[in-house]
């Protein structure tokens, strides 16, 4: 089932309608018709999330940037084929998952060090939050790097990207029961370390 763009046509006629206020579904409809402004808005909304996800998967800043470019190029070209079975953000992360896997197969030998990954900051944070985040982030990174890639990816999607089990299943191309199993084993492994704490 594709998105119904009928409402998008009505909203397009609205005088003074700001692209930044529109829903992701509306933006996809507009992008499918070649609207570059809507593509810019979609990119601005989601590029950081996609980049961080790609960076966690690839552990390489340059490779993650390439993945982001490929994701949004794919979104531009494939907007007309978007199926409304999931949120646009879930669709973008699923594309990122596949593009990152492809990129890793091409460049298996390069990884981002744990120190570099922990140094990634959110520009919205204040100095205290940055310090606290770095401290916790370093400890958490140590634990997460010990997890198998499939478990690490599921933890990343659920806790960092706030995706549901069903959305994670769509992104990684697995059954929901498989995602739950990976979550269980990841939590069990993290619980075994003295560094893991429940929020």
Q: Predicted segments — roles?
A:
Residues 1-29, 33, 41, 45, ...:
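Intrinsic, short, N-terminal disordered tails of RNA polymerase sigma-factor systems
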Residues 27, 43-44, 51, 61-78:
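Conserved RNAP core-binding helix
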Residues 32-33, 59, 70-87, 106-107, ...:
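Sigma70-family region 2
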Residues 52, 66-73, 86-98:
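Structural recognition of an alpha-helix C-terminal capping motif at a helix-to-coil junction
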Residues 63, 178, 185:
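Residues in the helix-turn-helix
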Residues 68, 183, 190, 194:
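DNA major-groove recognition helix of helix-turn-helix
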Residues 80-84, 94-114, 133, 185:
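Arg/Lys-rich amphipathic alpha helix in sigma70-family domain 2
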Residues 154-158:
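A short pre-motif secondary-structure segment
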């Amino acid at each position: 089932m594709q998105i119904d763009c009928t409402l998008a046509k009505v909203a397009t006629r609205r005088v003074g309608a700001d692209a930044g206020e529109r829903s992701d579904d509306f933006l996809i409809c507009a992008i499918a018709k070649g609207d570059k402004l809507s593509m810019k808005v979609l990119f601005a909304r989601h590029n950081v999330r996609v980049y961080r996800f790609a960076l966690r998967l690839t552990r390489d800043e340059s490779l993650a940037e390439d993945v982001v470019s490929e994701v949004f190029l794919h979104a531009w070209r494939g907007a007309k084929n978007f199926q409304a079975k999931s949120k646009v953000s879930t669709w973008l992360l699923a594309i990122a998952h596949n593009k990152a896997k492809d990129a890793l197969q091409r460049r298996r030998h390069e990884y981002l060090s744990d120190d570099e990954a922990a140094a990634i900051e959110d520009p919205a944070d204040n100095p205290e939050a940055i310090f606290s985040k770095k401290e916790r982030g370093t400890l958490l990174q140590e634990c997460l790097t010990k997890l198998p890639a499939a478990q690490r990816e599921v933890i990343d999607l659920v806790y960092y990207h706030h995706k549901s089990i069903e959305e994670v299943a769509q992104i990684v191309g697995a059954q929901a029961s498989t995602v739950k199993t990976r979550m269980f084993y990841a939590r069990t492994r993290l619980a075994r370390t003295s560094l893991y704490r429940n929020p």
